[in-house]
């Protein structure tokens, strides 16, 4: 219900929406990481919006599990995926007990997951996220099949200039 409420609130201000079913520090979201839940979320979402929807998927241990999740998204028009969220970390020293590791160390995993998903689903729109910290890495992901990129940690450490560096490099 909360997802639908937010879609109704924000759809007039967006050109697309991301539904994050994989935040590692939100315990209840794990229940959505299966094909039936994804199908249900998308079915209900399509009743209230025609905006493109991107489902942000978790970083999974068994790469073949992406097949099941992505097949559920393909039953709906204008649905893509975001690969992938942070790497889940559980540690009692964290104030909430769990969270997600981000940054450069995730890049190789992101690239592997992207290559697998692109080969299995050549038509799906893929936004790629995870460990992108240089123009070369951005180019590698785009050449491997990402349609667009999301950059978080590099933006924090490098500032907005990283976006300009990546864009300048890609335009050459």
Where are these regions (language model features)?
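Active-site glycine- and acidic-residue-rich loops that bind
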Residues: 1-4, 30-31, 51-74
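Hydrophobic faces of well-ordered beta-strands that scaffold small-molecule active sites
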Residues: 17-20, 53-55, 81-83, 117, ...
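Glycine-rich phosphate-binding active-site loops on the catalytic face of alpha/beta enzymes
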Residues: 21-23, 79-87, 132, 138-165
């Amino acid at each position: 219900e909360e997802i639908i409420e937010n879609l109704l609130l924000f759809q007039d201000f967006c050109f697309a929406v991301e539904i994050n079913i994989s935040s590692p520090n939100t315990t209840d979201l794990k229940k959505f990481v299966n094909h039936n839940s994804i199908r249900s979320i998308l079915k209900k979402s399509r009743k209230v919006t025609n905006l493109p929807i991107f489902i942000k998927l978790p970083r999974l241990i068994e790469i073949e599990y992406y097949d099941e999740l992505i097949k559920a998204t393909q039953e709906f028009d204008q649905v893509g995926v975001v690969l992938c969220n942070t790497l889940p970390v559980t540690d009692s020293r964290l104030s909430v007990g769990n969270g997600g590791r981000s940054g450069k160390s995730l890049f190789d995993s992101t690239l592997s997951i992207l290559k697998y998903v692109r080969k299995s689903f050549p038509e799906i729109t893929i936004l790629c996220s995870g460990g992108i910290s240089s123009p070369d890495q951005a180019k590698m992901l785009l050449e491997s099949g990402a349609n667009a990129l999301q950059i978080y940690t590099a933006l924090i450490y490098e500032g907005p200039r990283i976006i300009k560096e990546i864009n300048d490099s890609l335009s050459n």
